[in-house]
C-alpha cells in the first residue's frame, strides 16, 4: 500500500502533519497498515486529537510550531492539504525532508499507491477526477450521478468529503469496492500527488484563488495540471486560455476532449448551440458515425472543422434543473467525463435531467413578487461571481464582500456593468470592491450586516430581477463559514416573504 520503496521491508515510520479531516484519514490509514506514527499540529490540542485516540491510533503527538526535528527517525511524511509547503514554519521541514530523501505525500498519493497495490489482485476501477477554481462540487456530484445511472457502482470522495482514504477503507471493509471512483480534487491535494493517473480528468477553469498558498497564479495552474497522467483523457474548457495550456503535446498518447459555452468545432467536443431562441447541449461528431460514437482521442493541433462534422443535439439547456450557462458547461464536462470512460450516452442524458444541484451554488431559494432570490454563498472568489452573473444572464442586484483573500477585483467590472442594477457591499474588503467597480457607473451602497444588505437589495429589485448573494469573498470576517452566511441570507429572505404574505 506504500509503493515499491517500502514493499519488502518493515512499514515506514510516518510523520503526519496536520490533524484536519485528511490528516486524520492518513493517520488512520497508516495505522491500519502497521506503520509507526508521529502526528504533529501547530495547535497544542487540535480538534481531531480526541478522534485519533478514539479510533485506537497509537501515535506520538507533538503540538506547536513545525520543525525539522520532527523528522528524526521518519521515513515518510504525510502532509495535510490545508498546509502550504511554502509557509514559513513548514518550508524548512519540507526542505529538510527532501534533502534527506524522505518522500512527502498527500492523501491523494496514498490513494494512488493503494489502487496500484489492489490492482495486483485484479481490482481495476475507472477513476475520474475533477478540479478547477469553481464548479468542482457540482461537476463531481453530477458525474457520480451519471455513472450510477449508467449502472455502475460509484464512490464519490475527495475534497467533496468524505476523505479519500476513509472512503477506500470503508469499501475494503465492506467488500464493496466500486466500479468507478469520482474524485473532487483541490490544488492543495494535487500539489503532493506524484503517481496519480486517472482514466479521465477535467480542469473546469483557472482563475485567481489560493495564490498565497501556491506562491502565484502560474504555480496554482501547474498544481491543477497535475491531475493528468500520461494517458489520461483530458477534458478541457476551451473557453479558458489558461486551461487550454494544459492540452497534451503532439507526441502525447493522451486523448483530449473540449467543452464550452460556444459551439464545438472538432469531432468529440461538446458545447452549446443557440437556435431559434433555444439553447441546446450539443456534441460535434462525424456525420457518418453511429448514434453512439466512441469518445474521441484527438491530438492537440488536429485540423479543426473537417467537412463531415455535424452538431448532434443532446438536450435543451432548459431541461437542466441547475441554473446558468456556467452550469450548462459543468453538465457538459460531467457528460464528457462519463463518455470518456465508455458509458452509454442515453442513460447519461436521463441523469442530466434529474440532477438538482448543490446547496449554496447559484441556488434559487425563492421567487417573491417576480424577483428571484439566489444563494451563491459558495462563490468565494471573483471567478465564481463572474460565472454566476454571466450564467444567470438577467438583471441582478448583487450582494458582495467579505474576506477578499488578496484577490484582484477588477474582473468583476465588466459583468457588473452588463448585468447589475446595483451592488450591495458588505464585509472587510468592501472598499477594495468599491474601488474596482467605481468606473462602472453602477450604484453601490455599504451595509453593516448581510440582513441589512438583503433588505436593501429587495427594495431596489424589480420584477424579473434576481437578488444574488455571490460575495466573491470568503466569509470568515463575519460568519462561521459560507453555509452560515447562506443561512443568514435565507432567513432574511424568509422574513421578507412572510412580510409580503408569501411562504417559501
Curated annotation (Swiss-Prot):
Pathway as given in its UniProt record: Cell wall biogenesis; peptidoglycan biosynthesis
Residues forming coiled coils: none
Amino-acid positions noted as binding ATP in the UniProt annotation, renumbered to this chain: 132-138
Biological process according to GO: cell division; cell wall organization; peptidoglycan biosynthetic process; regulation of cell shape
One GO term describing the cellular component: cytoplasm
Pfam family, one: Mur_ligase_C
Ranges of compositional bias, category Basic and acidic residues: 286-295
Signal peptide region: none
GO MF, one example: ATP binding
Keyword check for Cell inner membrane: no
Keyword match Nucleotide-binding: yes
Top EC class for this record: ligase
Region of interest: Disordered: 286-305
Catalytic activity: UDP-N-acetyl-alpha-D-muramoyl-L-alanine + D-glutamate + ATP = UDP-N-acetyl-alpha-D-muramoyl-L-alanyl-D-glutamate + ADP + phosphate + H(+)
Keywords of the record: ATP-binding, Cell cycle, Cell division, Cell shape, Cell wall biogenesis/degradation, Cytoplasm, Ligase, Nucleotide-binding, Peptidoglycan synthesis
Gene3D superfamilies for the chain: Mur ligase, C-terminal domain (3.90.190.20), Mur-like, catalytic domain (3.40.1190.10), NAD(P)-binding Rossmann-like Domain (3.40.50.720)
InterPro entries on file: Mur-like_cat_sf, Mur_ligase_C, Mur_ligase_C_dom_sf, Mur_ligase_cen, MurD
EC number: 6.3.2.9
Cellular compartment(s): Cytoplasm
Family statement drawn from the similarity comment of this UniProt entry: Belongs to the MurCDEF family.
Protein name in UniProt: UDP-N-acetylmuramoylalanine--D-glutamate ligase
Organism: Paraburkholderia xenovorans (strain LB400)
Gene: murD
